[in-house]
C-alpha cells in the first residue's frame, strides 16, 4: 500500500464515518432541540426524517450521476453538501431551517454512500490489497456507527445540541483536502442516462406521503391539506410506475419486482428499517422524557443495539454459506420481534430489560440483513445487480423515513386521543385541562412544566405529570406493537415464500456489483452494520 492509496483510504473512510455518525447522533439531542424551538412531536419527526428522506429520494440518481460524471467529483459534492448542511444545522435559528439543513445533509450522504467504496475499489486493483483495504475502510466506518449515540450524548451534555453538527466540520474539511490532493477520478463508461422525470416524480410521491403521515395527527386526517397530500402521493406514485415501465433508462427498474424472492427481500428490508428506526426514535424519547436520563446516559443505553449489530454482522456470512439464507432471516425477524416485545413490557421495570431488548433488536437486525442481501442479489441477473442493489439501498432509506413518520405519528395520535380525557380527574377545570394537554403534546414531553397553567391547589387526586407519563408509555407501546405487527406480516410471508436453497459465495456476489452500487454489499445503512467479510461457498 503506497502513500496515495493510504490517503485515499483515509479520505473515503472518514467520509463514510461522518455519514454513519449522523445516523444516530441526533436522536439523543431531540429533547434539547425541542426545548430550543418549542416544537411538538411532528417537529422532532421532521428533524430525523428529513435526513433519511434526502437519502431515499436521491441515492439512486446519485449513483447514476457518479457513474456518468465521475465518482471523485460526486464524492466531493456529497462531502461538501453534507458539511455545509452540518454548518447550517448548527446555526439554525428555527426548526424549519434545521429540517431543511438536515435534508441537505441527507442529499450529501446519498452521494457519499454510493461513491466511497467505488473509489476504494478503483485505488486498489489487486485482489488481496483490495480485500485488506475494504477491511480497513469498514473498520473506520464502524467506529462511527457504534460510538454515535454515546458521543452525541457527551457533546449535548457538555456543549449543547448544536455541537453534534459542528463536530462534522473539521472532518469534512480534512476529507475534502485529502480527496482533492490524493484521490483519483473514476467513472463508468457504460452508465445509463440520468432519469430526471423519474427523479422528480419520486421526490413528489415520497415527500407528499411523509408530509401527510407526519402532519396528519396535528392538522387532522380528514383535513383538506392531508387529503391533498395523500392524493398527491398516490398520483405521483402511479405516474412514477407508469413512466418507469416505459422508460429505456429508468431510475428504478420495476421489472425486477416480478421475481417473488427479490420483491419479498426488498419488502423485508424496508420493514426492518421501518421498525428499527422508529423504535430508536421512540426509545430515545422514552429514556429522556419519561425516565429523565441525561443525553450521556441515554447514549450509553442505546449502545447495546449498535454493539450487537457490529459484533454479530461479521459472523452471519459464514452461517449463510453453511445453512442458507432462509433460516437466518426468519430467526433474525423473530429475535427482532422478541426485542420489541421486551421493550414494550419493560417500561415500568428495570433498565436492564431495556438494555436486553435493545441488544436483541440489534442481534436480530444483524442476523437477517446479510441473508436478505443474499436472497435479493442472487434473484437477479448479474448484469442487473447494480440496479437491484440501488433499489435495495433506496428502500432502506425509505423504510427508515416512513418508520420515523408512522411510529412517531402513532404516538402523537394516541396522546391526542387519550391525554385530555385521562387528565379529567386530576384537573377538573376544562380550560386548564385542555391547555395542559396541548402543552404536553406540543412539547413531546410529559414532564413539561405545568405550574404556570394549573396551580397546585387546582390539582386533584393525581399528579398530571404521572398521568402524562403513563399515556406516553402506552402510546410508545402501541407504536412498537404496530412495528411488531408489520414484522410479523413479513415473517409469515418469508416463511411461505423465501427460498430454501440460497448459498451464495462471496466471490460470486461481489462479481454482481460492478458499479458504484458495490457499496451496498459492504455497508448497510443500519447503524453498526458494517462488514467486509463475504461468506464462503
Swiss-Prot record:
TM region positions: 6-26, 46-66, 77-97, 104-124, 136-156, 163-183, 200-220, 223-243, 262-282, 300-320, 327-347, 352-372, 397-417, 478-498
Major location category of this protein: membrane
Alphabetical keyword list: Antibiotic resistance, Cell membrane, Membrane, Transmembrane, Transmembrane helix, Transport
Pfam families on file: MFS_1
Membrane topology: Multi-pass membrane protein
Similarity-based family: Belongs to the major facilitator superfamily. EmrB family.
Protein name: Multidrug resistance protein Stp
Taxonomic lineage from the root: Bacteria, Bacillati, Actinomycetota, Actinomycetes, Mycobacteriales
Gene designation: stp
Amino acid at each position: 500500500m503506497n502513500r496515495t492509496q493510504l490517503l485515499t483510504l483515509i479520505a473515503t473512510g472518514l467520509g463514510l464515518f461522518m455519514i454513519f455518525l449522523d445516523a444516530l447522533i441526533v436522536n439523543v439531542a431531540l429533547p434539547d432541540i425541542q426545548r430550543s424551538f418549542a416544537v411538538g412531536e411532528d417537529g422532532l419527526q421532521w428533524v430525523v426524517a428529513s435526513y433519511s428522506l434526502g437519502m431515499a429520494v436521491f441515492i439512486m440518481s446519485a449513483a447514476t450521476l457518479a457513474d456518468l460524471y465521475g465518482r471523485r467529483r460526486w464524492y466531493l459534492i456529497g462531502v461538501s453538501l453534507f458539511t455545509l448542511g452540518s454548518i447550517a444545522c448548527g446555526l439554525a435559528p428555527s426548526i424549519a431551517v434545521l429540517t431543511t439543513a438536515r435534508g441537505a445533509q441527507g442529499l450529501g450522504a446519498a452521494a457519499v454512500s454510493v461513491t466511497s467504496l467505488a473509489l476504494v475499489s478503483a485505488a486498489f486493483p489487486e485482489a488481496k490489497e483490495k480485500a485488506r483495504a475494504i477491511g480497513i475502510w469498514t473498520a473506520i466506518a464502524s467506529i462511527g456507527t457504534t460510538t454515535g449515540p454515546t458521543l452525541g450524548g457527551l457533546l449535548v451534555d457538555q456543549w449543547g445540541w448544536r455541537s453534534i453538527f459542528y463536530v462534522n466540520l473539521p472532518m469534512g474539511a480534512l476529507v475534502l483536502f485529502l480527496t482533492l490532493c490524493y484521490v483519483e477520478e473514476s467513472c463508468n463508461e457504460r452508465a445509463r442516462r440520468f432519469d430526471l422525470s423519474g427523479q422528480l416524480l419520486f421526490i413528489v410521491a415520497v415527500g407528499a406521503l411523509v408530509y401527510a403521515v407526519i402532519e396528519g395527527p396535528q392538522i387532522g386526517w380528514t383535513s383538506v391539506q392531508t387529503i391533498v397530500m395523500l392524493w398527491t402521493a398516490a398520483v405521483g406514485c402511479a405516474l412514477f410506475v407508469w413512466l418507469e415501465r416505459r422508460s429505456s433508462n429508468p431510475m428504478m427498474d420495476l421489472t425486477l419486482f416480478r421475481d417473488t424472492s427479490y420483491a419479498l427481500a426488498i419488502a423485508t428490508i424496508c420493514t426492518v428499517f421501518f421498525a428499527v428506526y422508529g423504535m430508536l426514535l421512540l426509545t430515545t424519547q422514552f429514556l429522556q422524557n419519561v425516565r429523565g436520563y441525561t443525553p450521556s446516559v441515554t447514549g450509553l443505553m442505546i449502545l447495546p443495539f449498535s454493539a450487537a449489530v457490529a459484533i454479530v454482522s461479521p459472523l452471519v456470512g459464514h452461517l449463510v454459506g453453511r445453512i442458507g439464507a432462509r433460516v437466518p432471516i426468519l430467526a433474525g425477524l423473530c429475535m427482532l420481534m422478541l426485542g420489541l416485545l421486551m421493550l414494550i413490557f419493560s417500561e415500568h421495570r428495570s433498565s436492564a430489560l431495556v438494555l436486553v431488548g435493545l441488544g436483541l433488536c440489534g442481534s436480530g437486525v444483524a442476523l437477517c440483513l446479510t441473508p436478505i442481501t443474499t436472497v435479493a442479489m442472487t434473484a437477479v441477473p448479474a448484469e442487473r445487480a447494480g440496479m437491484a442493489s440501488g433499489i435495495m439501498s433506496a428502500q432502506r432509506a425509505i423504510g427508515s423515513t416512513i418508520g420515523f413518520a408512522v411510529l412517531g405519528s402513532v404516538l402523537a395520535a394516541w396522546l391526542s386521543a387519550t391525554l385530555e380525557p385521562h387528565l379529567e380527574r386530576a384537573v377538573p377545570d376544562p380550560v386548564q385541562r385542555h391547555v395542559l394537554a396541548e402543552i404536553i403534546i406540543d412539547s413531546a414531553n410529559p414532564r413539561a412544566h405545568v405550574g404556570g397553567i394549573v396551580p397546585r391547589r387546582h390539582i386533584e387526586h393525581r399528579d398530571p405529570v404521572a398521568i402524562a407519563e403513563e399515556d406516553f408509555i402506552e402510546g410508545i407501546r402501541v407504536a412498537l406493537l404496530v412495528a411488531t405487527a408489520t414484522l410479523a406480516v413479513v415473517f409469515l410471508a418469508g416463511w411461505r415464500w423465501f427460498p430454501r436453497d440460497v448459498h451464495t459465495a462471496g466471490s460470486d456476489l461481489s462479481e454482481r456489483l460492478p458499479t458504484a452500487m458495490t457499496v451496498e454489499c459492504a455497508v448497510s445503512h443500519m447503524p453498526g452494520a458494517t462488514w467486509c467479510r463475504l461468506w464462503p461457498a
